[in-house]
Amino acid sequence: MRPLQEKIIAYEHVLPEIDPQKEIRKSIDFLKDYLKENPFLKSYVLGISGGQDSTLTGKLCQMAIEEMREETGDDSYQFIAVRLPYGVQADASDAADAIAFQKPDQDLIVNIKDPVDAMVKVVEATGQKITDFNKGNIKARQRMVVQYAIAGANNGAVVGTDHAAENFSGFYTKYGDGAADLTPLFRLDKRQGKAMLKELGCPKHLYEKAPTADLEEEKPDLPDEVALGVTYKEVDDYLEGKEVSEKAAEQIEKLWKKSEHKRHLPVTIFDDFYKKN
C-alpha cells in the first residue's frame, strides 16, 4: 500500500468491506444519539437532489426520526426534506422519486433562483465579475442558507451528505454543501453507499445514475468523474486499500493535497499543512 494511501484511509475511516445492514444501523443510531444528546433538537433538515448521496442520507434520517418517535412517544420529531432547484431542475423526476422512496414527514420546495440572481446582481454592481464557476458556488451556499433557515424555524439540525469518496478530494463547496451539523455517511465510499441503498430497496435508477454536481450553467450535467479526472471505482478501490493504476493513484493523491484546506476550516495559525517543505 502506498504511504499516503494508508494515511488517507485512516483519516476517512473506510473499511475494506462492509455489511450493509450493520452500516445502516450504525448511521441510524448515530442520528438518534445526536438527538438524544441534544434534546432541544426536534428535526433533521436535508437538501434532496435526487442523487445517490442525498437519497441515502434522507432515508436514514427518516428511519431515525421514526424510531425516535416510537421510542419516546414524542411526535414532534420530524424529518424535513427540501428540494432546492435553481429555476427548473433537469432531473426533477429523480428528486421526486427520491422523496417517494424516503417518505419524509415534510417535503418542501424552495427555488433559489431569485436570491442567487439577486446576489450576483448586487455584487456585479460594484464592478466585480462573477464567473459561472463562482456562481455555482453561490448556488451551493444559498441552498445551505435555506436549509439552516428551515432548521432554525423547526428546532433542527442540518444533515450533510459528505462521504469518503467526496471528502478526500474536497468535492464540495466550502460553506455550501460542505456545511452541515452532522454527516452520517462519513466513513463510506461510493460503492458502499450504493450497497446500502440496495439493501433498503431503493429504486435502481437513483443509485446507478452518473453523479453530477450540476452547478455550472456552462457545463450542465458535468459528471463528477470527468471533473475529478478519476473514476469512482478507482477512488473506492484506493480507499479500500486495493491497488489502482499509477495514474489513478497520483490523481487521487493530487486531489487530496489540493483540497487539504477544506479539511481545516478555518485555517488557524497552528496549521502548517499549506507550507511547502
Curated annotation (Swiss-Prot):
It catalyses: deamido-NAD(+) + NH4(+) + ATP = AMP + diphosphate + NAD(+) + H(+). Mg(2+) binds at D53, E166. Its EC number is 6.3.1.5. Gene3D superfamilies: HUPs. Pfam families: NAD_synthase. Pathway: Cofactor biosynthesis; NAD(+) biosynthesis; NAD(+) from deamido-NAD(+) (ammonia route): step 1/1. Homodimer. Catalyzes the ATP-dependent amidation of deamido-NAD to form NAD. Uses ammonia as a nitrogen source. NCBIfam families: nadE, PRK00768.1. This is NH(3)-dependent NAD(+) synthetase. It comes from Lactobacillus gasseri (strain ATCC 33323 / DSM 20243 / BCRC 14619 / CIP 102991 / JCM 1131 / KCTC 3163 / NCIMB 11718 / NCTC 13722 / AM63). The lineage of its organism: Bacteria, Bacillati, Bacillota, Bacilli, Lactobacillales.
